[in-house]
């Protein structure tokens, strides 16, 4: 965390983020941002700890940024979900009591959900065998979780290799598979607010949506209910498979998902060359009115930015307001900001998630 965990200072820290976003978007005539706050504690649904040996025992540990040698021992973690905090001492007691579970265990990862699901990944510097699997199965049953053991590129799965999340958007509950090791939004309460904002911002449409960087379908599912059809792109195989499962589970049947990068999609739309992965998809049949982007921290590269310019509306979720501002600067001659928002995904840090709806001038 970049700032001390202090719930009493939360409002002050949030005000500073709002001021920073206003400052970055002021050159573009942005309206006042809608602000979506976070729970003050127990908001983070995932956590990762190294294990540190001290006084003959292994402890949960984290490290200060830039210092991998001075461990900060962790007994509880108030920013993490209540489920993670409840699991931490029970898991620690299990590895301390069991040679099979504790031997050469060096890292533990927790993933929980608002729906009450939980998964624990245990990482080892040794091969895992049947003896480990027997004890891990007992552990999973005792804790009511899925357990995954990892060792040198191999993994053993006890239960499922994904957690199930359920999010309510405009009165409809969407179910999501969140695969082990894949990206998920860490702050479930704020993610739900973010989905609701995007759902409202796009409005009820009679045309089509193009989505870049769709991940596991976090935004795809609710936004698909607002448009005629969706073409969504993603390059991660794990995320693509999760998104396909999520579409099927939620009976969302107006989405085509293709494994293409933004650069490849640009080439396809410009008819530079054909792609086998687009076989059976007629790009000319789509009437894209909106493009939705949720890029990595680096923002959109200049070519992707130019791709979005051809659309009347650009719905942009950003995890880095500086690169968001840089992208808007590239687009401001053709698009204006109609609405914007700040989502406090990461309390007690300088990081913020933001969203803008850009509309053609």
Curated annotation (Swiss-Prot):
Annotated signal sequence range: none
A Pfam family the protein falls into: tRNA_U5-meth_tr
Listed GO MF terms: rRNA binding; tRNA (uracil(54)-C5)-methyltransferase activity, S-adenosyl methionine-dependent; tRNA binding
Active site: 319 (nucleophile), 353 (proton acceptor)
Catalytic activity, EC: 2.1.1.-, 2.1.1.35
Enzyme superclass (EC): transferase
CDD domains hit by this protein: AdoMet_MTases (cd02440)
Disulfide bond positions: none
GO biological process: tRNA methylation
Residues given in the record as S-adenosyl-L-methionine binding sites: 185, 213, 218, 234, 294
InterPro entries, per the entry: MeTrfase_TrmA_AS, MeTrfase_TrmA_CS, SAM-dependent_MTases_sf, TrmA_MeTrfase, U5_MeTrfase_fam
Catalytic activity entry: uridine(54) in tRNA + S-adenosyl-L-methionine = 5-methyluridine(54) in tRNA + S-adenosyl-L-homocysteine + H(+); uridine(341) in tmRNA + S-adenosyl-L-methionine = 5-methyluridine(341) in tmRNA + S-adenosyl-L-homocysteine + H(+)
Keyword field: Methyltransferase, S-adenosyl-L-methionine, Transferase, tRNA processing
Family statement: Belongs to the class I-like SAM-binding methyltransferase superfamily. RNA M5U methyltransferase family. TrmA subfamily.
HAMAP family in the record: RNA_methyltr_TrmA (MF_01011)
Name of the protein: tRNA/tmRNA (uracil-C(5))-methyltransferase
Species in which this protein is naturally found: Pseudomonas putida (strain GB-1)
Lineage: Bacteria, Pseudomonadati, Pseudomonadota, Gammaproteobacteria, Pseudomonadales
Gene designation: trmA
């Amino acid at each position: 965390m970049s700032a001390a965990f202090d719930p009493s200072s939360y409002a002050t820290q949030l005000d500073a983020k709002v001021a920073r976003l206003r400052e970055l978007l002021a050159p573009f005539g942005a309206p006042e941002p809608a602000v979506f706050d976070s729970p003050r504690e127990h908001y983070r649904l995932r956590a990762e700890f190294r294990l540190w040996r001290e006084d003959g025992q292994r402890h949960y540990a984290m490290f200060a940024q830039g210092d991998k040698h001075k461990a900060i021992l962790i007994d509880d973690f108030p920013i993490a979900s209540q489920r993670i905090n409840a699991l931490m001492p029970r898991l620690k007691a299990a590895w301390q009591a069991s040679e099979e579970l504790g031997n050469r265990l060096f890292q533990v990862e927790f993933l929980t959900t608002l729906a009450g699901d939980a998964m624990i990944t245990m990482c080892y510097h040794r091969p895992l065998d049947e003896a480990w699997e027997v004890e891990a199965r007992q552990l999973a049953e005792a804790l009511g979780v899925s357990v995954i053991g990892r060792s040198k590129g191999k993994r053993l799965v006890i239960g499922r290799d994904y957690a199930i999340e359920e999010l309510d958007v405009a009165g409809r509950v969407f179910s999501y598979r969140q695969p082990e090791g894949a990206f998920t939004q860490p702050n479930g309460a704020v993610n739900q607010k973010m989905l609701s904002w995007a759902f409202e911002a796009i409005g009820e449409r009679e045309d089509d949506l193009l989505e870049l960087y769709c991940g596991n379908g976090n935004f795809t599912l609710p936004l698909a209910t607002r448009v005629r059809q969706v073409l969504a792109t993603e390059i991660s195989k794990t995320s693509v498979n999760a998104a396909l499962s999520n579409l099927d589970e939620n009976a969302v049947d107006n989405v085509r998902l293709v494994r293409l990068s933004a650069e490849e999609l640009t080439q396809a739309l410009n008819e530079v060359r054909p792609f086998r992965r687009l076989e059976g998809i007629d790009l000319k049949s789509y009437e894209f009115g909106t493009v939705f982007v949720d890029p990595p921290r680096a923002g959109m590269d200049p070519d992707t930015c130019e791709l979005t310019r051809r659309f009347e509306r650009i719905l942009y979720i950003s995890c880095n307001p500086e690169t968001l501002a840089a992208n808007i600067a590239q687009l401001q001659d053709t698009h204006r900001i109609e609405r914007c928002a700040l989502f406090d995904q990461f309390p007690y840090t300088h990081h913020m998630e933001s969203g803008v709806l850009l509309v053609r001038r």
